[in-house]
Swiss-Prot record:
Residues 194-207 have a biased composition (Low complexity). Residues 149-169, 182-222 are annotated as: Disordered. Gene3D superfamilies: Classic Zinc Finger. This is Kruppel-like factor 3. Belongs to the krueppel C2H2-type zinc-finger protein family. It holds the Pfam family zf-C2H2. Keywords: DNA-binding, Metal-binding, Nucleus, Repeat, Transcription, Transcription regulation, Zinc, Zinc-finger. It comes from Caenorhabditis elegans. GO terms for biological process: fatty acid homeostasis; innate immune response; regulation of gene expression; regulation of lipid metabolic process; regulation of transcription by RNA polymerase II.
């Protein structure tokens, strides 16, 4: 027992010596990283008995962060814009063929006219043996344009006689009778005036359109002497007629006069116009003079036939 107590103090002194050595080492090394200092403090604390056989923690290595790299997108490749004009053609150096050996015959120089030009849009075709070949395009000269212009038509007047129109063959052919249709004029005075005046043209030489336009002008022009206007004299009525019979029939509507009386037995109908009496008489006789051309139906009045024909057209 006494031996154990005497050997104990040297062991505690060794432990405290290690602690002092650790403190001195820590104070002398101020540049040690903070992580290693903390590990050493935890490993060799004065309150913990050091274990020389224990494994020490390896220092933690923190790799440095590389600066970020900016990756730019690839540059876009734009296609050249389309242009209606063709790109300029590079000039090809002229090719001169090798000189032929001298011959005994001399040929005259060939002159090319200035209107033969080279087309710049044709691509030359070359080979090892043949020189570059260019297609030639001839421009249209003034002579060609003059020949392409349409010929001017000469205005020819009709011949004075039919024999001249047929030429020399007219004497060999039989006589041809030229028939011109004669259209009656609406007024006899117009025909008399054309016959009396030598300067005016005859009615046969006028076209139907000219005669129709003249008739319409006579109807529309009330100041003409040939155009007679029959106006109604009843107060407040402004109707006008070209025929006196139409005016008389109109005046009977104002006066109430009905001179046309039906003579059928036991019939006392009276009318202001004669055509109305004729149409009324067909009711007694049963006459139907208006017949349909498409079917076998007959009608007593023309307006009834016109209405019936419209029904055929709609079917």
């Amino acid at each position: 027992m006494l031996k154990m107590e005497q050997s104990a103090p040297p062991r505690y002194e060794e432990d405290w010596a290690d602690v002092y050595e650790f403190i001195e080492r820590d104070s002398s090394r101020k540049n040690v990283p903070a992580i290693e200092a903390i590990e050493r403090r935890l490993a060799f604390s004065p309150l913990i008995t050091p274990n020389p056989g224990a494994k020490q923690f390896a220092p933690i290595h923190v790799p440095g962060r590389e600066p970020p790299r900016m990756l730019l997108p690839p540059t876009p490749h734009f296609q050249a814009p389309f242009s209606p004009h063709p790109p300029p053609v590079q000039q090809v150096p002229s090719y001169s063929p090798p000189h032929a050996p001298p011959s005994y015959e001399t040929y005259p120089e060939v002159y090319y006219p200035p209107h033969i030009i080279c087309n710049p849009y044709d691509v030359p075709t070359t080979s090892d043996r043949n020189p570059p070949y260019y297609t030639e395009v001839t421009t249209v000269s003034a002579v060609t344009l003059h020949s392409m212009t349409p010929p001017t038509h000469k205005i020819e007047t009709p011949p004075s006689s039919p024999e001249n129109s047929f030429g020399p063959l007219a004497s060999q052919l039989p006589a041809i009778k030229m028939e011109i249709p004669m259209h009656p004029l609406p007024h006899n005075g117009e025909l008399d005036s054309t016959r009396s005046s030598p300067s005016s043209t005859t009615s046969s030489e006028r076209s139907p359109l000219q005669r129709k336009s003249r008739i319409e002008s006579n109807k529309r022009n009330p100041t003409d002497k040939k155009f007679v206007v029959h106006a109604c004299t009843y107060p407040g009525c402004f109707k006008k007629y070209s025929k006196s019979s139409h005016l008389k029939a109109h005046e009977r509507t104002h006066s109430g006069e009905k001179p046309f009386v039906c003579k059928w037995q036991n019939c006392s109908w009276k009318f202001a116009r004669s055509d109305e009496l004729t149409r009324h008489m067909r009711k007694h006789t049963g006459d139907k003079p208006f017949r349909c051309s498409l079917c076998d139906r007959n009608f007593a009045r023309s307006d009834h036939l016109s209405l019936h024909m419209k029904r055929h057209s709609t079917i």
